[in-house]
Swiss-Prot record:
It catalyses: ATP + H2O + polyamine-[polyamine-binding protein]Side 1 = ADP + phosphate + polyamineSide 2 + [polyamine-binding protein]Side 1. The keyword Metal-binding does not apply. It is found in: Cell inner membrane. The complex is composed of two ATP-binding proteins (PotA), two transmembrane proteins (PotB and PotC) and a solute-binding protein (PotD). Belongs to the ABC transporter superfamily. Spermidine/putrescine importer (TC 3.A.1.11.1) family. It comes from Borreliella burgdorferi (strain ATCC 35210 / DSM 4680 / CIP 102532 / B31). This is Spermidine/putrescine import ATP-binding protein PotA. The lineage of its organism: Bacteria, Pseudomonadati, Spirochaetota, Spirochaetia, Spirochaetales.
Amino acid sequence: MDNCILEIKNLSHYYDNNGNKTLDNINLKIKKNEFITLLGPSGCGKTTLIKILGGFLSQKNGEIYFFSKEISKTSPNKREINTVFQNYALFPHMNVFDNISFGLRMKKTPKDIIKEKVKTSLSLIGMPKYAYRNINELSGGQKQRVAIARAMVMEPKLLLLDEPLSALDLKMRQEMQKELKKIQRQLGITFIYVTHDQEEALTMSDRIVVMNEGIILQIGTPEEIYNEPKTKFVADFIGESNIFDGTYKKELVVSLLGHEFECLDKGFEAEEAVDLVIRPEDVKLLPKGKGHLSGTITSAIFQGVHYEMTLEIQKTNWIVQSTRLTKVGEEVDIFLEPDDIHVMHKE
């Protein structure tokens, strides 16, 4: 991989002496200036991986190369890697300026350089007039920005962010997502971001690493992860999905509920049992008799930007999202284009 700055090779970690693994044979390459997100449910190993990369935890086996140098034995303060934690870890007895400048002062950086770097950092996070505010006077979003500024002022080659926005309300979280992406682009620093929030990962990332039970299930762009999931878990975890049992009848044709549909996926045997993934927003509703399969709307909920409806077809429930409401009890048909159906091998 061109411009690779971090390479993780065959890395494993055990959480007890019985061989139970938190991380199982992790292999990953990360590029310079990349915003990469580790995404998965609680307990999947993503925070453990961040702690190992930051030097706060040691792996059982495997290697970590940072700019081609093995750093497993390198102490955290010598790695040129900084970490922003979920709880901010700010010093409550220091003001904003002193919090941001703490690392620089520990390195005995000249005062005039410290002043200039802090000024630049405050401007970057949109808080130029907050240098001498007390930490307890700040909102949650402002505290998070200060924590990020404190990490960035050290000019790390790599910034690790462990669920930094999880304590914020929805609106503030969305605003900070935009700010973080903007800051990352301006500085050209590589970000490794940890979250269990699928929307957050899809919004911010250049690439997403989907993890579960200590292993990497899929690596790809947000578009690849959403539109081309490789496993049932990924399809179900990233957004809402309709996942049905189907049959790959022949090349570019699948069978679902007795109807044959055209598809775009290849690489399957004739008559192979497969999983079919259909996103709720891709299901088109038509008047009865005009589509592929017929069913009845059994529920409808308004969710702000669209209606989410449940459609029963041959005793299977389909989630359908549309800006147009179809009333409960109404009989309709569905219509699917070839690119609305994603075919996966059975696990």
